[in-house]
Design a protein with these regions (language model features):
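C-terminal, non-catalytic "cap/extension" segments appended to globular domains
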Residues: 1-118
Length: 118
Protein backbone atom coordinates (compact mmCIF):
# COMPACT_ATOMS: atom_id res chain seq x y z
CA UNK A 1 0.00 0.00 0.00
CA UNK A 2 0.99 3.63 -0.31
CA UNK A 3 1.07 3.91 3.47
CA UNK A 4 3.51 0.99 3.70
CA UNK A 5 5.76 2.52 1.01
CA UNK A 6 5.70 5.87 2.82
CA UNK A 7 6.75 4.22 6.07
CA UNK A 8 9.52 2.21 4.39
CA UNK A 9 10.86 5.28 2.63
CA UNK A 10 10.71 7.32 5.83
CA UNK A 11 12.59 4.59 7.71
CA UNK A 12 15.27 4.41 5.02
CA UNK A 13 15.75 8.17 5.05
CA UNK A 14 16.12 8.08 8.83
CA UNK A 15 18.64 5.23 8.54
CA UNK A 16 20.69 6.93 5.80
CA UNK A 17 20.60 10.53 6.97
CA UNK A 18 19.84 10.37 10.69
CA UNK A 19 19.30 13.79 12.16
CA UNK A 20 21.18 15.54 9.32
CA UNK A 21 17.93 15.94 7.38
CA UNK A 22 14.88 17.53 8.92
CA UNK A 23 11.72 15.57 8.09
CA UNK A 24 8.77 17.49 6.69
CA UNK A 25 5.15 16.48 6.01
CA UNK A 26 5.69 15.39 2.42
CA UNK A 27 9.09 13.68 2.54
CA UNK A 28 7.49 10.26 3.05
CA UNK A 29 5.76 10.58 -0.34
CA UNK A 30 8.99 11.25 -2.23
CA UNK A 31 9.22 7.58 -3.28
CA UNK A 32 6.20 8.09 -5.57
CA UNK A 33 8.11 10.47 -7.86
CA UNK A 34 11.14 8.19 -8.33
CA UNK A 35 10.59 6.18 -11.54
CA UNK A 36 13.19 3.57 -10.56
CA UNK A 37 10.63 2.10 -8.17
CA UNK A 38 7.77 1.58 -10.59
CA UNK A 39 8.95 1.70 -14.22
CA UNK A 40 10.07 -1.69 -15.44
CA UNK A 41 13.43 -1.66 -17.23
CA UNK A 42 14.15 1.93 -16.19
CA UNK A 43 17.44 1.34 -14.40
CA UNK A 44 19.09 -0.90 -17.02
CA UNK A 45 19.35 2.14 -19.30
CA UNK A 46 22.05 3.57 -17.05
CA UNK A 47 24.21 0.46 -17.32
CA UNK A 48 23.76 0.06 -21.06
CA UNK A 49 24.31 3.76 -21.67
CA UNK A 50 27.48 3.73 -19.55
CA UNK A 51 28.70 0.63 -21.38
CA UNK A 52 28.11 2.18 -24.80
CA UNK A 53 29.71 5.47 -23.78
CA UNK A 54 32.75 3.67 -22.38
CA UNK A 55 33.17 1.70 -25.60
CA UNK A 56 32.85 4.84 -27.74
CA UNK A 57 35.35 6.80 -25.64
CA UNK A 58 37.87 3.93 -25.72
CA UNK A 59 37.57 3.75 -29.51
CA UNK A 60 38.15 7.48 -29.83
CA UNK A 61 41.14 7.39 -27.47
CA UNK A 62 42.75 4.43 -29.25
CA UNK A 63 41.75 5.01 -32.89
CA UNK A 64 41.64 8.79 -32.94
CA UNK A 65 40.01 10.83 -35.68
CA UNK A 66 38.29 7.98 -37.60
CA UNK A 67 36.49 6.85 -34.44
CA UNK A 68 35.60 10.44 -33.58
CA UNK A 69 34.13 10.88 -37.07
CA UNK A 70 32.11 7.67 -36.63
CA UNK A 71 30.79 9.07 -33.36
CA UNK A 72 29.75 12.32 -35.07
CA UNK A 73 27.98 10.28 -37.78
CA UNK A 74 26.20 8.34 -35.03
CA UNK A 75 25.06 11.56 -33.34
CA UNK A 76 23.72 12.94 -36.61
CA UNK A 77 21.41 9.94 -37.07
CA UNK A 78 19.12 11.10 -34.27
CA UNK A 79 16.32 8.61 -33.73
CA UNK A 80 16.29 7.33 -37.31
CA UNK A 81 16.60 3.66 -36.29
CA UNK A 82 16.75 1.38 -33.27
CA UNK A 83 19.55 2.43 -30.87
CA UNK A 84 21.36 -0.92 -31.19
CA UNK A 85 21.61 -0.42 -34.95
CA UNK A 86 22.64 3.22 -34.63
CA UNK A 87 25.41 2.45 -32.14
CA UNK A 88 26.99 0.17 -34.73
CA UNK A 89 27.73 3.33 -36.74
CA UNK A 90 29.93 4.41 -33.82
CA UNK A 91 31.55 0.97 -33.80
CA UNK A 92 29.71 -0.40 -30.77
CA UNK A 93 27.75 -3.64 -30.98
CA UNK A 94 25.48 -3.75 -27.95
CA UNK A 95 24.11 -7.12 -29.06
CA UNK A 96 27.43 -8.64 -27.99
CA UNK A 97 28.70 -8.88 -24.40
CA UNK A 98 31.92 -7.00 -25.26
CA UNK A 99 30.82 -3.42 -24.41
CA UNK A 100 29.54 -4.48 -20.99
CA UNK A 101 32.68 -6.54 -20.34
CA UNK A 102 34.88 -3.59 -21.31
CA UNK A 103 32.88 -1.26 -19.07
CA UNK A 104 33.34 -3.65 -16.16
CA UNK A 105 37.09 -3.83 -16.85
CA UNK A 106 37.26 -0.03 -16.89
CA UNK A 107 35.29 0.14 -13.65
CA UNK A 108 37.61 -2.41 -12.01
CA UNK A 109 40.69 -0.47 -13.16
CA UNK A 110 39.28 2.76 -11.75
CA UNK A 111 38.35 1.05 -8.50
CA UNK A 112 41.86 -0.40 -8.18
CA UNK A 113 43.32 3.05 -8.81
CA UNK A 114 41.02 4.59 -6.22
CA UNK A 115 41.86 1.93 -3.63
CA UNK A 116 45.58 2.46 -4.20
CA UNK A 117 45.11 6.12 -3.26
CA UNK A 118 43.53 5.32 0.09
Amino acid sequence: TAEWMCQQYEDLNAQYYGSAVEKDDVMSYEWARIPHFYNAFYVYKYATGYSAATAISKKILTEGKPAAQDYIRFLKTGESDHPIELLKIAGVDMSSPLPVQQAMETFNQLLDEFESLL
